[in-house]
Amino acid sequence: NSAKEDKGSIMVIVGTDLPLGERQLKRVLKRAAVGLIRTGSFMGHGSGDVFIGFTNANGIPDTKEEQFHMMKYFPENQLDKVFRLVAEAVEESILNSLTCAKAMPGRDGEIYHSLSEFL
């Protein structure tokens, strides 16, 4: 049934100050999809869901005098907590955007109503 096909896309941006390495950040982003799924999405073939993330924990010094730079990394055995927290944060962000949005006009003057009008 085409009415039940997945429609729409979402972009999820995860920012953290945890000192995550590239591989760790990719693992965290995979768990961000759990928050999306908790809100009812099934991420079908037609959806264009994008997950990007960054950490600002390990800055790069501006001085050229330092030949080497020490980086910190988050302990692997504590990543389960981060996975759980990112899923909760994504879920909460989606629910907040749904309940706090305002009605707005769309194409050809069609009004897209907000859930906040009915709550």
Positions of predicted regions on the chain:
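A structural signal for small-residue-enriched, beta-sheet-centric alpha/beta enzyme cores
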Residues: 1-119
